[in-house]
Amino acid sequence: MTTAARLGIGGPVGSGKTALLECIVPLLTNQGIEVAIVTNDLLTTEDAERLKSGGILPRDRIIGVETGSCPHTAIREDPTMNILAVQDLEQLFPNLNLIMIESGGDNLASTFSYDLVDAYIFVIDVGAGDDIPRKKGPGFMQADLVVINKIDLAPYVNANLNLIRKEASVYRQSKPIAYTNCKTGVGLNEVVNFILERVLFRTALSVKNLEK
């Protein structure tokens, strides 16, 4: 049995982690990538049910884990539940290329254990304020890719997007950043190409503009 690549998706509550999955999974499957998902919630499987209802994957390729603890415990200090869920998916679907593990909503200190994932994406949204980059949380600083989501909301929440771009580049240095709007498709090509090139070691999409 071939082991699938594992990609974490983390970030604060409401930053758009589940919405990002809804947008990028179809783009990956259209490229022939065999995908499955593990979601984390404290006391429910709400995100898993949302993804199943959305039809982006067959329902049995999505597993919801009720962590019953701080969200970061299940992805860092003790990822046993998630590892078991990943193993279940690999046994059920031996041809999987990629398993995406969405953490429960957490804070800027949230990071994934590399015993659980090969790489992880940290999602924030401009609604949290334009000072997020300079707060230098471990999740933001250490993630393999940072996604700054909901960029269309910047003028409505008085967030300076130019300042976010400037400071994010300073504090992330050479680490990649994608600026996204899941409703229009802005920036999704960068996220998908990161997954293809950095996680799956495949050729990037030739289509450079995925905007709707």
From Swiss-Prot:
One of its GO terms (molecular function) is nickel cation binding. GTP binds at G11, P12, V13, G14, S15, G16, K17, T18. It is found in: Cytoplasm. InterPro entries: CobW/HypB/UreG_nucleotide-bd (IPR003495), P-loop_NTPase (IPR027417), UreG (IPR004400). One of its GO terms (biological process) is urea catabolic process. Gene3D superfamilies: P-loop containing nucleotide triphosphate hydrolases (3.40.50.300). SUPFAM superfamilies: P-loop containing nucleoside triphosphate hydrolases (SSF52540). One of its GO terms (cellular component) is cytoplasm. Signal peptide: none annotated. Keywords: Chaperone, Cytoplasm, GTP-binding, Nickel insertion, Nucleotide-binding. The keyword Oxidoreductase does not apply. Homodimer. UreD, UreF and UreG form a complex that acts as a GTP-hydrolysis-dependent molecular chaperone, activating the urease apoprotein by helping to assemble the nickel containing metallocenter of UreC. The UreE protein probably delivers the nickel. Belongs to the SIMIBI class G3E GTPase family. UreG subfamily. NCBIfam families: ureG. HAMAP family: UreG. Facilitates the functional incorporation of the urease nickel metallocenter. This process requires GTP hydrolysis, probably effectuated by UreG. This is Urease accessory protein UreG. It comes from Trichodesmium erythraeum (strain IMS101). The gene is ureG.
